Amino acid sequence: MLVQFSAAIAAIGMLSSVALAQGVALTDPQIAHIAYTAGQLDIAGAKQAISRSKNKDVRAFAADMVSDHTAVNKQALDLVKKLNVTPKDNDTSRALTKQAADKRAELSKLKGAEFDKAYIANEVAYHTTVNGALETTLIPSATNPELKSLLQTGLKIFQGHQQHAEQVAAALK
């Protein structure tokens, strides 16, 4: 279960890296779409956790994910409007969306502590992968200084999410 999701979410890094290796650099509109999509997917997963979990720590973590990712995505939308740029859908965004939908369906079959552990384990894997992709691919590939700055700010927030998820995961063992 976790392996399937971890492999799927690695699409951020792998597909982005493949594009770069082939000399096809990601454009700022593609980067903006990937980043926004990743945030929306984490919000959807967090809302699922809020509705299904009874664990106060898991629910608090999920509420933070909704709040923080909503705020970062609002900043992203404000920036693309200011720059008059339309985020461009791409293979990475589509792969992430499909895999996240599959994972939410898988999680919907779990209950109680089993759900909590699986959700938090996914959050650890998700943020580890997203943070790696931000550091190694998305931030270096961004050409607009304001987009690059927003991605760097997001990375700091998401590194905190990763640490928080790791703490909750340890407490659930």
Walk through the language-model features, giving the residues of each:
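His/Met- and acidic-residue-enriched segments that coordinate or traffic transition-metal cofactors
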Residues: 2-7, 12-173
